[in-house]
Structures are given as C-alpha cells and as structure tokens.
C-alpha cells in the first residue's frame, strides 16, 4: 500500500520527529511511505536526510502549519494521485490533503499540540475538512477541546500516539552524573527561561545542559548572563540523539508552558532518569502515578524547590513504573496501532476486521 504523509511545516521538533519515526517504522513493516511538506527549514530538511529520506517540499516562503493555501492544494494533487491513504500532520497539511486527494481515498490527520492561530480560525475550511477526513488523531486534551469547539464530531477524533527514540543503542555522553538536562526546542512555550530562573535559585547548583535549538536561544544566553549562572549552563545545540545526553542525568526537566504530551519526558522515563515537569495539558497525565514530579507552570520558585528535593534525595519518582509506561511508546508499538487503524480504513467492505493489536498488549496502551 502506498501511503503519503503530508506535513504543513517541517522543522526540528517533536511532531515532525514523531511523523518521521512512524513513517520509518511502517516502511519496516512493508508499507510504502512518501513524505511531502508545505514549507521546511534547512534544519528540517536535514533532519529527514539524516534518516535517509528525501523530503519533497512545495516551498512556501511562510509556515503552512495554519494556512489554507490553494497553491499547496494544486501542488499536492498530482503527487497524491496514486496514494492509497494520505496522512496529514498539522491543520494546513490535512486541510490541503483533504482537498487534493482523490474521492474515496482515505485521508487522516494528526494534531500534536494545542492551536495558536495567528489570526481568526478558518472555520469554514475546518468544517469542510472535518467532513472529508476519515479520522483525526489528537495528541493532547487542549487540542481535542479546541477541535470540538470548532465543530468536530467526537467520533472523528482518535487519541494520537507519538513514538520515542530507541534506547537500545544509547551511547551516554561522559558528563557529571549530578547534572540537569533539558532537551527540546528553545522556544517560549517550552519554558526554558523558567528553568534558568529556577536554576539561579538552587543551592549547590548542578550544571545544566540545554539540548536543542530555536528562536529563544539568544534571549536565554542573555538571561543566563544576567542571572550569573552562565558558567553553569551549556548550550549543546540540536542533537539527533538526545538520549545520549539524558542518560545517567540526575534529572530531566520539562518546564513547559504548554505541552500536549512530551517525548522528552517519556524518553527520560525509558532511560530511568527522574523527570521534573509542569502540570500542563497532557503532560500532567504523563507525570501522574508517581512517574514524575509535577509543579505549577511559570513558577521558578516551585521548580527550584522540586529540583532541590530531588537532588537531595527527599523526593523520588517511580522509575520502574515510568519505564513501564515508556515501553508503550516504542516505534514498533506505535506503528502497530496506526497500522491497525489504516487497515480498518483500507479493508474492503465485508472482508472482516483486521486484528486489533491492543489485544496483544496491555490495556493501558491506549491511555496517554
């Protein structure tokens, strides 16, 4: 079966990595997977090339994450002509895919984060696409609530799954064990500025490694200097292997202002590294049941206290429980769920239902 994955805007980020990992895992299972994008940064294109994949890009000069671009639709149409199934990631992609795909071809969408519309939401375009989509996978509670408010049928919405990096071939970077690690985009919504403010309040301060890149980097460097913690903070830059930096750390910190889930948090759990994060959106559930320590967002003092307590051994997380939770999000297990969903949509009428992979897994796999 030929599947085409369409991404609105490709940059080094969690949602794009999730789409890439899923596509690679499905190819290992015999699915033909082709990637298309509306717009892409040089780093995004290089990310795909590093995995041996060429990304076919429409070439918009602006991000198409939120845009209804008729030119993108026209560009997509001939490229989707032989597709058996189309999966769009981000509104601009699944809207365009729904317009461009041939009648009768299943079209599904994915939304990884809550919407931050740059202008008024295009309600007409949204509702038209809702009627054309066969399924819409949603990765967090905030995005689900927004979609329902904009008119999506609850039956259209399915819980999305993101796959984490494999931890089987981790090569830990030789660093002090007593360290903190942040891995993710250096963006305001991820809260790295809050982490720097908290670090300045921590007594017997450990070194902090910021693994990632993004538009907030210059601001963060200035902030570290202003706080007098410049010597304690290392800007690592983007890494395709964040697990190598997280492995063996005293804690992985996820100080997000908004987060539908968190690949970084779950990756740290798979590595048996304690996680300190914020009680926001879907991240709250990730950290529940003792799997991590949750504090209020945008509260440097609360974050500093939690880090001190963890460093001093006064607070512990359930590392085994966290590892069990993380095991549900390997590429192969996530691919099984999507493969089952695709097979349902592609099965001829009257041919019977494909085998549900959740019957062979623990029942908790469908819970974030």
Outline where the language-model segments fall.
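N-terminal strand-loop element at the rim of the active site
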Residues: 5-68, 215
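A conserved mid-protein helix/loop that constitutes part of the nucleotide-sugar donor-binding site
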Residues: 16-24, 178, 182-201, 215-222, ...
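A conserved, positively charged/aromatic
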Residues: 80, 108-134
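Short His-centered aromatic/hydrophobic patch
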Residues: 88-94, 111
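Aromatic "clamp/platform" in nucleotide-sugar-dependent glycosyltransferases that forms part
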Residues: 238, 257
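Short hydrophobic beta-strand element within catalytic cores of glycosyltransferases
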Residues: 274-277
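Conserved acidic donor-binding segment of nucleotide-sugar-dependent glycosyltransferases
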Residues: 289, 293-300, 309-314
